[in-house]
Amino acid sequence: MSGVLPGPAVTLIVGTMLFVLVAAYQRLRPKPLQGIPYNQGAASKLLGDIPEMMGYVLRTKRIFCWLTSLTTRHQSPIVQAFIKPGALPWVVLTDPFESQDILLRRTREFDRSGFFGELIGGILPEQHIQFLSADERFKNPRNLINHLMAPTFITKVSAPEVYKSTCTLTKVWEAKCAQAQGQPFSAHHDITYAALDSIFASSFGLSESQSITSQRLEAVLHMDPEMTDHQVEFPEGTVPEVFAAVLTLTNSVTDTQLSPAPVLTSWVLRQLPHIKKAIAIKDKYIRDQVNQSVRLIEDGKIEPWNALHSVLLREKDVAAKDGRQPDYYKRSIFDEFFGFMMAGHDTTATALAWGVKYLTDNPVSQTRLRDALRTGLPQAATEKRLPTYQELIKTHIPYLDAVVEEVLRHANPIAFVVRQALQDTTVLGHQVPRGTNVFLMANGPGYLETNMTLEDEARSPGARQGQSKGLTGVWDNNDISAFRPERWLRKIPGTGDETFDPMAGPTLAFGLGPRGCFGKRLALQTLKIQFALMIWLFELLEIPEKFNSYDGVQRFAREPTQCYLRLKAVN
């Protein structure tokens, strides 16, 4: 019998392996933070909440709505989820006022999370928004591009290009309106390509012949539409390869967002031939544009021609102050502009696509906006023409501001903001250790769903409504889920006139504080121009239910699966 018993060496090896496995399990298994609700079943599994989350992703092609659903499930404004084995849980927060305090005041305790870098770092390794505020990789590029969001630059350079591209888009829709004869057509690509046109034009300059929307207009004017299944299908036209490359790379972020291992997913994607090709096309295009701007600088042109030319002029000035040669071709400049193209076109196009749907389904709001525009721009109305760019930017129309904000509140192009704890701290009275990712959700209770009952004392001092200034109002539970732009208006005492109130209630469409969305000013100006021209020219008619789903899909931003128009020209 003794011959079949394991020897000491085998026993030691087996024992060591068991010890290592047990130690690894203990190291990797979920470790809940005390007092914060969580899924009990997930806490006992090595993969935590990953199986449930991925099941939701496979069904819906969305991820962040699942995070918000946990707060409803546990009836708590703060929950935790176990997404990365061996790592700290994700903390999910839906209380608007605690979120505002974190973003606006507690900037020494919370900063940009590395989570965003995991999503975009593979294709944008030096884009500034993924780095901590104290990091030179954040500060130096930001100093180069800050002036692009100055009101003067937007007014003189960027917004005129938005106006031009939107006018071309309305010509496409005028042609489609005439040919469709009251039947619906998909507007999604029209909106996406017009957004790309305006971003490319303001960033690099874009001639009429290079405009994809102009090409689509020619295609519509010279081809007969095809009627299928009670909708009209129009020709798409040819998509320039650099536009296609931007869309390919933007859509690749979808896969990283929906993956529990985004860094690995991004690496795998970058090995694929079509992604490699898209990266090469994008890099060559930006390099060619840099070459063109450098020639302008060498020829002595110092008046900014476009955003890239302006940034390179700034690089020249900074280099002179630093006593070095300007580096016009550094990777950070390339990444800043590609990030600008990718995020800028996708978020504004998505917001407009959702806005088309909400205004179509809320004809009272649509009519009120049209009346407000014609009242605010009486000369254009009298002369029966489009408002000029100068007329639009010089005229303040409170209801237009309100419509834009209400669309953003409902659309939730970016449904969350994520911050990382820089030190051991508290959130809603719960201990949160250093390194924890805190997801501040903008699509749940307090934003679009009934406010959760929470004693003010449970919040951090800066988040208490009775003690802290600078907090927004609270949305009325009776209509919090309704599309109602009027919620953003208040009457001026004494005159009774209405004014737009950006603090009427909570929203996180652009984040808040020093690390809020860099492109917020341009995005708001863009949406105001687009909605103004669209509603000035067209009545958005009711869409058949089969073409009017409100399902969304997570790409770079959350976009609607269907965006159809039935248009009637407004005299």
State where each predicted segment sits:
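N-terminal membrane-proximal hinge/A-helix region immediately C-terminal to the signal-anchor transmembrane segment
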Residues: G3-Q127, E136-N140, Y163-T168, R434, ...
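Conserved cytochrome P450 K-helix E-x-x-R motif and the immediately C-terminal K′/meander segment
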Residues: Y56-T72, L386-L428, E449
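Cytochrome P450 heme-thiolate monooxygenase catalytic core
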Residues: G114-E118, V157-L352
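Cytochrome P450 I-helix active-site segment
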Residues: P235-T238, D361-P413, P433-T436, R459-P461, ...
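Short, small-residue alpha-helix embedded
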Residues: T347-T360, Q530
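Cytochrome P450 heme-binding "Cys pocket" and the immediately downstream C-terminal segment
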Residues: P363-Q366, M503-P506, L512, K520-R558
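Conserved cytochrome P450 K-helix/beta-meander segment immediately N-terminal to the heme-binding cysteine loop
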Residues: N443-D497
